[in-house]
């Protein structure tokens, strides 16, 4: 049936055959069109009209959907963000000049991980393509999956950033998932050997889009050779990945995939950085969620996250780098102090900080501007934005060279100074491009007058052709002396010089006869012929020349892409340092001390996010942890009193400190933490068929299997999703395990309502009890938000229920039930004591199963005592030492009557 198709439809099917798993955007004049099943998909996803045109292979009417070519930046991101791949099939020649059907071809394939248009992702986020390589090593890991050796690479083609790492030790599967959570790639590619691993693919697909991709190489050795060719180096040792076999393989996979989709060399990807998970604090996906590092739990936006609380950066590069620093806090005390030195200097010098941030506000997204320039997707407005950005750099550089003292600031200044051509490039753009150019680079109007004599002449000809013809006619009259000479034009002969027969003897020798008429002859000269061509094509030539000039400028800029990217990174780092200094000064943060020991000492610590959102001030609290007496802090207290906030703020202060930020405290000393683990909140994983309790246990297993003596563990209510006996048993076992792990145990904060756990302080030497103080005022409960030593025996659940708006009838009934349970507990305890042994009756079992502690207990450790029952009040007034046996018996009968 192909003979029934038009030539254009045959082109479409050829493109579809080459890219069967990809939607085709097929350029037809002023539209991108799609046909068949692609059209149905596009119409549905973009909510546009589905029509029909022509016939398909079977002779049926062909479904059609199309969008205007100028609206592609609006529609394309919607498809990419839904996980589709889109092949852009462009017209490869001017339809006006085409002989026959217009040549068309796929010029790039846009996938989630290879998008370069800024409309497809936020300025503050990287758009990573992740490539994974590896193999099974046979044994089963702690989490139940097969142990693997993995190489991971992350490539952001919009900025040129390229990273690789490798995990060959135990727990590599969990480390892979942690990197996935931190880097948040838009797309992940796997070789066929790993794509067949359903466990791996399913876990990856929980967080990103997964594609199968087989690079066209024979193996790891060829991958290394291909990378050397791309980077124009003889060895990969300088990049630190020479011995990372799977890292190298994954790196080439990512690069080949990007080259295949973009159909160009990607020269701006000019270096590969190797990193190790031993360089950074590990924050897995659970911890990132629970601590709301870059996204909040409520709607996964960035408001009310740590990142948004600290992010007042001036540049997109700075926003992205700040996010990276928070996701990857450092482990090296020396490197952390380099950052802190720079922040301290900028915080202490407000004039320097103000000037730098003022200049930074002029800087646009240099990284992505350079990426678009190298890709050939930039327009003249991008060049103007780059020029304005480069104009600010010399002022920043000179200011730092003159005033900066911190090593990191001086390094930035020296790096900026090493790019000596920066002013020249800015000047080149400024001389050539108008200040407010049009969006299109194919329609002219972007090059300044005076930049090119040829362009000025073409423009002059195009706009002043009549004046030029009149001037030429007068010039020829004066030269020949023929007063009747005139210049004419027709579509057949073009421009000509007409001389009457009476003046034919005066015709100069350089006139060339074009046409003989009855009363006159028509001539042309080489100059007129040249001008005729210019006049007739002046506008087209002017537009073409403007594009040629624009292309020459972009090629010059592309040749400096590496230096421009390095400049962008230095500017971004400076932006983060200045931002952290600004936040520190505005919020009264202090410089933390970092140590190699296991101590954590925080005075007047505050939760950075909560502090920024609450009115009336935040109640600060101290934290003291070490490996001797304060390794495990057991925190009790009512719901809503602030236990979770207290635990989270401790972790956030440590993360901020190791990221290089000042912290919300009057004093902070942090023994470097290698991992932060959290078990907070209750979530069902319905998609995986996991209950709340199962999710809790999976997270707990990860903590117990992977936490080290340098880790920090936050546990909030272990065992809530099961029976009280089971929950308490698990919670107690966890405390003992973490306390006794290794020689010094693992630093942990554990918030619990299992008040019997507080007795562990007497049995385990490094467990310390703390509680959140509250105050009862009549029926009201006041949360003091202050953490104080000792345990509490009350949860104040009914008080909290009242605060939550539970109907008063329910509250009253709950109090009645509570008093009944307390009365049963007193009676059971009395009988137990009388029998001299523990009772195993139904009432005791039922009550203990619910509460696990004596609600009438008076341990003396609680700061706030609840209201006394009548029996308790009577007992409290008794002076047993002064009572006779008969009086005691009578009082006992009275108490029994009170109990009913």
From Swiss-Prot:
The keyword Membrane does not apply. ATP binds at residues 637-644. GO terms for biological process: mismatch repair. It comes from the Archaea. Keywords: ATP-binding, DNA damage, DNA repair, DNA-binding, Nucleotide-binding. This protein is involved in the repair of mismatches in DNA. It is possible that it carries out the mismatch recognition step. This protein has a weak ATPase activity. Belongs to the DNA mismatch repair MutS family. PANTHER family: DNA MISMATCH REPAIR PROTEIN MSH1, MITOCHONDRIAL, DNA MISMATCH REPAIR PROTEIN MUTS FAMILY MEMBER. This is DNA mismatch repair protein MutS. The lineage of its organism: Archaea, Methanobacteriati, Methanobacteriota, Stenosarchaea group, Methanomicrobia.
């Amino acid at each position: 049936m192909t003979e029934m198709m038009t030539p254009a439809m045959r082109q479409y099917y050829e493109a579809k055959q080459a890219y069967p798993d990809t939607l085709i955007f097929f350029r037809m004049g002023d539209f991108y069109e799609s046909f068949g099943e692609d059209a149905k998909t596009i119409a549905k996803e973009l909510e546009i009209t589905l029509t029909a045109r022509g016939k398909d292979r079977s002779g049926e009417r062909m479904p059609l959907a199309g969008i205007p070519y100028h609206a592609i930046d609006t529609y394309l991101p919607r498809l990419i963000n839904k996980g589709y791949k889109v092949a852009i099939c462009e017209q490869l020649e001017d339809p006006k000049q085409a002989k026959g059907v217009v040549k068309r071809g796929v010029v790039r394939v846009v996938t989630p991980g290879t998008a370069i248009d800024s409309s497809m992702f936020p300025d503050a986020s990287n758009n990573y393509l992740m490539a994974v390589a590896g193999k099974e090593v046979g044994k089963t890991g702690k989490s139940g999956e097969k142990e693997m050796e993995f190489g991971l690479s992350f490539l952001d083609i919009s900025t040129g950033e390229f990273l690789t790492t490798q995990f060959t030790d135990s727990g590599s599967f969990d480390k892979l998932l942690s990197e996935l959570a931190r880097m948040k790639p838009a797309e992940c590619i796997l070789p066929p050997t790993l794509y067949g691993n359903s466990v791996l693919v399913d876990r990856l697909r929980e967080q990103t889009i997964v594609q199968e991709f087989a690079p066209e190489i024979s193996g790891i050795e060829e991958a290394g050779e291909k990378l050397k060719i791309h980077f124009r180096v003889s060895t990969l040792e300088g990049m630190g990945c020479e011995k990372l076999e799977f890292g190298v393989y994954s790196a080439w996979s990512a690069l080949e995939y990007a080259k295949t989709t973009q159909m160009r060399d990607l020269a701006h990807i000019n270096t590969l950085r190797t990193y190790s998970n031993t360089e950074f604090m590990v924050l897995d996906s659970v911890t990132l969620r629970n601590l709301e590092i870059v996204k909040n739990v409520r709607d996964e936006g960035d408001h009310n996250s740590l990142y948004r609380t600290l992010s007042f950066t001036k540049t997109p590069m700075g926003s992205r780098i700040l996010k990276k620093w928070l996701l990857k806090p450092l482990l090296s005390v020396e490197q952390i102090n380099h950052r802190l030195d720079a922040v301290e200097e900028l915080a202490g010098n407000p004039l320097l900080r103000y000037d730098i941030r003022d200049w930074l506000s002029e800087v646009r997204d240099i990284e992505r501007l350079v990426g678009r320039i190298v890709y050939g997707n930039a327009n003249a407005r991008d060049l103007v934005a780059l020029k304005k950005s480069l104009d600010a750099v010399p002022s920043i550089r000179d200011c730092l060279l003159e005033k900066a003292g911190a090593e990191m600031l001086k390094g930035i200044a020296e790096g900026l100074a090493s790019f000596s051509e920066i002013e020249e490039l800015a000047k080149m753009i400024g001389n050539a491009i108008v200040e407010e150019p049009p969006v299109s680079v194919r329609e002219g109007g972007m090059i300044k007058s005076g930049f090119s004599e040829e362009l000025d002449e073409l423009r002059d000809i195009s706009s002043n052709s009549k004046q030029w013809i009149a001037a030429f006619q007068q010039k020829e009259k004066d030269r020949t002396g023929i007063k009747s000479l005139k210049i004419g034009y027709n579509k057949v002969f073009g421009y000509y010089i007409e001389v009457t027969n009476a003046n034919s003897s005066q015709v100069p020798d350089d006139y060339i006869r074009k046409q003989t008429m009855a009363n006159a002859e028509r001539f042309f000269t080489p100059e007129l012929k040249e001008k005729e061509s210019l006049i007739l094509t002046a506008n087209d030539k002017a537009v073409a020349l403007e594009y040629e000039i624009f292309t020459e400028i972009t090629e010059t800029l592309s040749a400096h892409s590496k230096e421009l990217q390095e400049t962008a990174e230095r500017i971004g780092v400076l932006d983060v340092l200045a931002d952290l200094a600004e936040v520190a000064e505005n919020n009264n943060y202090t410089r933390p001390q970092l140590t190699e020991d296991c101590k954590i000492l925080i005075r007047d610590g505050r939760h950075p996010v909560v502090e920024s959102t609450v009115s009336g001030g935040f109640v600060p609290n101290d934290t003291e942890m070490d490996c001797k007496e304060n390794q495990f802090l057991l925190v009790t207290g009512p719901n809503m009193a602030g236990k979770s906030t207290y635990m989270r703020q401790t972790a956030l202060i440590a993360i901020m400190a190791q990221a290089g930020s000042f912290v919300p405290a009057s004093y902070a000393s942090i023994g470097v933490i290698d991992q932060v683990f959290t078990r907070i909140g209750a979530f069902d994983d319905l998609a995986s068929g996991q209950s709340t309790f199962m999710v809790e246990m999976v997270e707990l297993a990860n903590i117990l299997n992977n936490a080290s003596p340098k880790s920090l563990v936050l546990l909030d209510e272990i065992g809530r999703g099961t029976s009280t006996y089971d929950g308490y048993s698990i919670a107690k076992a966890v405390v003992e395990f973490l306390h006794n792990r290794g020689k010094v145990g693992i630093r942990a904060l554990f918030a619990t309502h299992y008040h019997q756990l507080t007795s562990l302080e007497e049995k385990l030497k490094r467990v310390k009890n703390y509680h959140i103080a509250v105050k009862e005022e009549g029926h009201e409960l006041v949360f003091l938000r202050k953490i104080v030593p000792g345990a509490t025996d009350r949860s104040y659940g009914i008080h909290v229920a009242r605060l939550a708006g539970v109907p008063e009838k329910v509250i009253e009934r709950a109090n009645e039930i509570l008093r009944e349970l307390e009365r049963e507990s007193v009676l059971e305890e009395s009988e137990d004591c009388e029998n001299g042994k523990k009772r195993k009756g139904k009432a005791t079992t039922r009550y203990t199963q619910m509460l696990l502690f004596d609600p009438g207990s008076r341990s003396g450790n609680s700061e706030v005592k609840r209201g006394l029952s009548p029996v308790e009040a009577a007992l409290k007034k008794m002076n047993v030492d002064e009572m006779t046996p008969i009086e005691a018996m009578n009082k006992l009968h009275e108490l029994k009557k009170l109990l009913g």
